[in-house]
Amino acid sequence: MENTQKTVTVPTGPLGYVYACRVEDLDLEEISFLAARSTDSDLALLPLMRNLTVEKTFTSSLAVVSGARTTGLAGAGITLKLTTSHFYPSVFVFHGGKHVLPSSAAPNLTRACNAARERFGFSRCQGPPVDGAVETTGAEICTRLGLEPENTILYLVVTALFKEAVFMCNVFLHYGGLDIVHINHGDVIRIPLFPVQLFMPDVNRLVPDPFNTHHRSIGEGFVYPTPFYNTGLCHLIHDCVIAPMAVALRVRNVTAVARGAAHLAFDENHEGAVLPPDITYTYFQSSSSGTTTARGARRNDVNSTSKPSPSGGFERRLASIMAADTALHAEVIFNTGIYEETPTDIKEWPMFIGMEGTLPRLNALGSYTARVAGVIGAMVFSPNSALYLTEVEDSGMTEAKDGGPGPSFNRFYQFAGPHLAANPQTDRDGHVLSSQSTGSSNTEFSVDYLALICGFGAPLLARLLFYLERCDAGAFTGGHGDALKYVTGTFDSEIPCSLCEKHTRPVCAHTTVHRLRQRMPRFGQATRQPIGVFGTMNSQYSDCDPLGNYAPYLILRKPGDQTEAAKATMQDTYRATLERLFIDLEQERLLDRGAPCSSEGLSSVIVDHPTFRRILDTLRARIEQTTTQFMKVLVETRDYKIREGLSEATHSMALTFDPYSGAFCPITNFLVKRTHLAVVQDLALSQCHCVFYGQQVEGRNFRNQFQPVLRRRFVDLFNGGFISTRSITVTLSEGPVSAPNPTLGQDAPAGRTFDGDLARVSVEVIRDIRVKNRVVFSGNCTNLSEAARARLVGLASAYQRQEKRVDMLHGALGFLLKQFHGLLFPRGMPPNSKSPNPQWFWTLLQRNQMPADKLTHEEITTIAAVKRFTEEYAALNFINLPPTCIGELAQFYMANLILKYCDHSQYLINTLTSIITGARRPRDPSSVLHWIRKDVTSAADIETQAKALLEKTENLPELWTTAFTSTHLVRAAMNQRPMVVLGISISKYHGAAGNNRVFQAGNWSGLNGGKNVCPLFTFDRTRRFIITCPRGGFICPVTGPSSGNRETTLSDQVRGIIVSGGAMVQLAIYATVVRAVGARAQHMAFDDWLSLTDDEFLARDLEELHDQIIQTLETPWTVEGALEAVKILDEKTTAGDGETPTNLAFNFDSCEPSHDTTSNVLNISGSTVPGLKRPPEDDELFDLSGIPIKHGNITMEMI
């Protein structure tokens, strides 16, 4: 736990409110863009946002009135019990939801959810959750408030800790305490909710029969209220909150989860098990029973390092339920947290600033939801996503050092098991129960799986389809079935579909799944995989530069030195030095720190050959000067061990647990919750074997006895390197507590004479999870097992730096050569071509096929300068990424110079890439089928309406689809405080010798699924990817400037063409794409070409080529016509290749610059680097004569 304790003052209040709004006072169009609602239900979820669903002055964290305690002689008085909590990030519309537009036009989603629920054996919400319930309808509430039921929307805003208590009818409406607040255009009435325990002093538990007015715990003289039960609200909470949690916890009795969570909300001292003992489990053959694993080795083989579990799966089932119980306790810890972040104010969103009228705001909102669809889709398309972790596996007992079985952190793990959910169920002893469900070997993705991961909630499923409808069909990953042809071709066929009719088939959920079927995950045998998580960056601080946290502040500061200011020490860090370099480059007009990924500003600086060469000289000089000074300060002033620091450097970032940062809509909040549950259970499962070891686990009382032990072991993991928490001391606002008077009932005004006592004065607040990635691959094989050593040897080959000739366009200056080719080499174009072509020009140059008389003196001088710069950079380069802008070149160049100072050799370093989501208008008729709102009467009518939609996209704010771009300036992307998706694997280990504390590390890993997840993913072990959807500048302000099998995809073919080079690479790429994609190529634009090539300039060339071919064709565009046009263009450009040149070819290999621009990089080790001059024999690292005090501490080993 952190040593620093913070004090926070919070107000007191009810556990929730029912808001009553007139329809005309709400911005329903904007609300509908953020809501979750299906077409067949009036129930809906909305995000908790100020000036949208709650008032601007809404207080999100408070001390909730959760009960009463007797005080005084003979218990004559009462004191209110107060429990800290924050409001749940989603609100529940249970009346008037029909006024909110459905998230998706897909019909009968409730039917789909019910069918999937029955297939997988989860319980339904049938009737009231308690006996004797009396319903309070929405119409009754409206009538009591004097509002028209048909023109009123009612929704519940509830604290996170007590939402299950609302479902269990343990609350009542306090009509006497209603007040009026202002939201958007009008006044809104809100009714507070309080727990019925307020009328039952000293009852610190869930009341199983709240409608029993003769309950013996009711205080004498108290006027007991009518508990609040509403059928629609209970169904909404059950399906959209509790059932998704039950799926994640593998508990099919959903009401048992609700009962356990509600009990923990009232009883803060409960530590035992809360889930019932009769929980059922999915039957499947565990790999630890001696069967073949996914890796092909038998668990009971004599050469295996693990043994089969002797309990026949009993310990696996026990670990599953105990981890689920621990996760429920962890949810209570989170729900009682006090967070400073407040719900976002929609009126303060930067993307709405300066917009007039409704349509521009809706267009901006529609565009941003398409961006969000990129990260939502990644969680759906990745098979190792936290959404699919529905089962627990036992990898078998590991061998301890003495040869016997010992406790292991890695024995139990979660794995993706939706394909097993329909298997029969077993009890705790493994006996198969009678069940209608049967297992199936068909692992094809279906709508049932989507319903499963959504907890069978139709509103959540509709919202998930809302985002999937904005994802493309994966046209670049092979198997390019056309959804339009599928719908039109089957329109008159009798296809059995339980969800749609002919006229609604284009918008059916099955059609959406069919369109995306190539991207949907496939599940197989249980294997340990990284966890695909969804989270939010709530801080602009991250160590995502090429060398991560090299030379950090905590290491550079001198312990006990009170004379130096912290800011002075901070200026000597690697992070601050790189920032100063960017400032220097900005002053030279080479970089715009507000848009560091763009090189457009260089157009005003580079106007001819001399300015281009001057830019190279300035860039090199600035970087080398900054790096030399930085290393000098580290060694001379800071006494920093530069080589040891490099081996310890890590990339790092933190994903916040703050409940409102990821609450853009109900689905993003849902994904945050699923991520939390997956991470918590991963940690809890790691401690299960340690709890089981040496115990008689088969005992009936074992779980109740050792559940508190597992919970304490889990809590001990906090602040151990992965989950960060902070202790907060809570104080109450001055004044008495306002609450209903128990002697007057629920209609009387609130009494203001109560005192309140906090259940816990000190609260542990979960802040964030830390993700790290080691910068340098060490290749050290000592103290490792044989299996680990073999894996490390395989990794070493991937990290081995290869010495090869550098292609100029793929080197350090490739992006500049492409951007300014037309300016520098206007005649550098193929014969019979009208536009300069850098691929053709540099290919001929490097093949020594360019006639010398076609080059001017200025061009030759520039070519020599480019060649020298590129070769010098390549000689010291250990980063397996070509720069794509000045910012990337500067940070890579500086990182390589630091590596050179540290004598780094042999291995490439780990690098980071941020895939940034974007938005574009759809161009393919297949991608707009789900937006067809008119009934279709024929197959031809479908295509006609789809094309009509494409013609008026500007007036339809919902017509946006997602797009992707990439950048290696990851810190700049993290400054946007984005929503992110990435893979993490959590390692657990003991501390130093004699330290029994368990530490963890959230290792940055990958998302399985390859290009199905994102078209810009590439298989490279040295790279780490993160998909980001920026929030800064859109919905929050910004301050300051795969799996192991690599698939053969169209993107891989295109990248292969680019790597192989060629004079007319554009024509080869275009022909390949047309052959693979077919008629879809007609609608391809710049974003599509960029997704394929990951090269902005080549993508623009391909876009121009595409437009040229369309203009050339005399008939409408066809595949055959396009390929014929490509063939004609190729013949024209190669017509002169067979001619004998009249003069000698320009010799590129012997090209050298006419002037010497000696690099001032110093080689600390004295070793030579190809392309750099050997330093003089008497050259020293730094002149140390002026520092006599430090001279004795610097050794030759350090130098």
From Swiss-Prot:
Which keywords does this Swiss-Prot/TrEMBL entry list? DNA replication, DNA-binding, Host nucleus, Metal-binding, Zinc, Zinc-finger
What the entry lists under InterPro entries is as follows: DBP_sf, Viral_ssDBP_head, Viral_ssDNA-bd
List the signal peptide residues. Answer: none
Question: Zinc finger regions (unnamed), where?
Answer: 497-510
Location of the region described as Required for nuclear localization in the Swiss-Prot/TrEMBL record = 1172-1199
Query: Which family is annotated?
Result: Belongs to the herpesviridae major DNA-binding protein family.
What name does this protein carry?
Major DNA-binding protein
Which is one Gene Ontology cellular component term of this protein?
A: nuclear viral factory
Function field:
Plays several crucial roles in viral infection. Participates in the opening of the viral DNA origin to initiate replication by interacting with the origin-binding protein. May disrupt loops, hairpins and other secondary structures present on ssDNA to reduce and eliminate pausing of viral DNA polymerase at specific sites during elongation. Promotes viral DNA recombination by performing strand-transfer, characterized by the ability to transfer a DNA strand from a linear duplex to a complementary single-stranded DNA circle. Can also catalyze the renaturation of complementary single strands.
Query: Which Gene Ontology terms cover its molecular function?
Result: single-stranded DNA binding; zinc ion binding
> What Gene3D superfamilies is this protein classified in?
1.10.150.560, Viral ssDNA binding protein, head domain
Query: Where in the cell is the protein located?
Result: Host nucleus
Tell me the segments the record calls region Disordered.
Answer: 289-314
- Principal subcellular localization: host cell
The UniProt entry annotates the motif Required for filament formation at 841-842, 1146-1148
- Which Gene Ontology biological process is one annotated for this entry? DNA replication
> How does this chain assemble?
Homooligomers. Forms double-helical filaments necessary for the formation of replication compartments within the host nucleus. Interacts with the origin-binding protein. Interacts with the helicase primase complex; this interaction stimulates primer synthesis activity of the helicase-primase complex. Interacts with the DNA polymerase. Interacts with the alkaline exonuclease; this interaction increases its nuclease processivity.
